[in-house]
């Protein structure tokens, strides 16, 4: 095939895809009820993507409909925090908290670019103020407090804003006697904030102790790809029940760092969810499309447990 023929085929194929999208959105292919089940896509970000595991080409519209699970190999691709909220929370019941809280460049940190400029860049890119969304909502009719980290915002790194929003969420859940879920997806503590980011580990752990041990309220940690560093070393592993997605990368330090420190070869796959489950570090590995139903059953079972009675049940 000549180069000119290749360009012509590419142009023609692109036109067919564009016509398909146009017809679909006008209702010629999908009915109004069917269209409501599909999430609108931003065509400026591309119509196709590649699976990180099997490298199969995936059509973005159907990938989002399938909860970002590869239809070829079942691999769970990364989701945004907004998509995860839509996955777990009943429609029309989500009430966000502390949406306007933003980070300050207290240390005046700068490497290739200033910390202030990096924050502004990711805020514009993601539409978020920082690497987590918190709020309250209902999961199959059960009121819950939910925090969802977003890896697309500076690698989901935990700074002072992330730590403060999680702390306030836990305190609210404790006062309201609500179960708590935190979906973890993070590269660890945010280096641009130094010790201010590291102290969030202790701060969050201390309020979790009140929520779990003193008030006997449920906390479920959901570990997704990737969960590493200070998040793994603190609230990521403090859940009454710890759930992971299939093949999620969960670690404190990376494989290369461990090998350089121990000066020995580390086996492949020892930091994936299945390996951690085999060694007793996880309670459940749940596929994304089953997660909401599993959480609902856990809440019902927990509410009936005699050892976990408290004054204000989250069931009416």
Swiss-Prot record:
Localization: Plastid, Chloroplast stroma
Transmembrane segments: none
Catalysis: reaction(s): N(6)-carboxybiotinyl-L-lysyl-[protein] + acetyl-CoA = N(6)-biotinyl-L-lysyl-[protein] + malonyl-CoA
SUPFAM superfamilies: ClpP/crotonase
GO biological process: fatty acid biosynthetic process; malonyl-CoA biosynthetic process
Top-rank lineage group of the source organism: Eukaryota
PROSITE patterns according to UniProt: COA_CT_NTER (PS50980)
Documented EC number(s): 2.1.3.15
This protein's pathway: Lipid metabolism; malonyl-CoA biosynthesis; malonyl-CoA from acetyl-CoA: step 1/1
Domain CoA carboxyltransferase N-terminal: 47-316
Gene Ontology MF term list: acetyl-CoA carboxylase activity; ATP binding; carboxyl- or carbamoyltransferase activity; zinc ion binding
Cofactor: Zn(2+)
Function: Component of the acetyl coenzyme A carboxylase (ACC) complex. Biotin carboxylase (BC) catalyzes the carboxylation of biotin on its carrier protein (BCCP) and then the CO(2) group is transferred by the transcarboxylase to acetyl-CoA to form malonyl-CoA.
Cited HAMAP family: AcetylCoA_CT_beta
Family: Belongs to the AccD/PCCB family.
The protein, known as: Acetyl-coenzyme A carboxylase carboxyl transferase subunit beta, chloroplastic
Organism for this UniProt entry: Marchantia polymorpha (Common liverwort)
């Amino acid at each position: 095939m000549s180069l000119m023929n290749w360009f012509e085929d590419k142009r023609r194929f692109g036109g067919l895809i564009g016509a398909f999208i146009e017809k679909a959105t006008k209702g010629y292919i999908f009915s109004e009820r069917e269209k409501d089940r599909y999430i609108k896509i931003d065509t400026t970000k591309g119509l196709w993507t590649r699976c990180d595991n099997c490298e199969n080409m995936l059509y973005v519209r159907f990938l989002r409909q399938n909860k970002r699970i590869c239809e070829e190999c079942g691999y769970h691709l990364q989701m945004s925090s907004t998509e995860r909220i839509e996955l777990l929370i009943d429609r029309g019941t989500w009430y966000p908290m502390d949406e306007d809280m933003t980070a300050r460049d207290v240390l005046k940190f700068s490497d290739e670019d200033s910390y202030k400029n990096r924050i502004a860049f990711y805020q514009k890119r993601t539409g978020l103020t920082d690497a987590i969304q918190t709020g309250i909502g209902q999961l199959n009719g059960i009121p819950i407090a939910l925090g969802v980290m977003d890896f697309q915002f500076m690698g989901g790194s935990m700074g002072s804003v992330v730590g403060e929003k999680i702390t306030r969420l836990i305190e609210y859940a404790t006062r309201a006697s609500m179960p708590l879920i935190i979906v973890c997806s993070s590269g660890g503590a945010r280096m641009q904030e130094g010790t201010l980011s590291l102290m969030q580990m202790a701060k969050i752990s201390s309020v979790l102790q009140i929520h779990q041990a003193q008030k006997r309220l449920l906390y479920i940690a959901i570990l997704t790809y990737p969960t590493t560093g200070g998040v793994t070393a603190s609230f990521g592993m403090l859940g009454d029940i710890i759930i992971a997605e299939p093949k999620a990368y969960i670690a404190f330090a990376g494989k290369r760092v461990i090998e350089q420190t121990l000066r020995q070869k580390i086996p492949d796959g020892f930091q994936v969810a299945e390996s951690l489950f085999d060694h007793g570090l996880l309670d459940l590995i749940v596929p994304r499309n089953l997660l909401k139903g599993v959480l609902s059953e856990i809440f019902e079972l927990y509410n009936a447990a005699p050892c976990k009675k408290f004054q204000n049940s989250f069931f009416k």
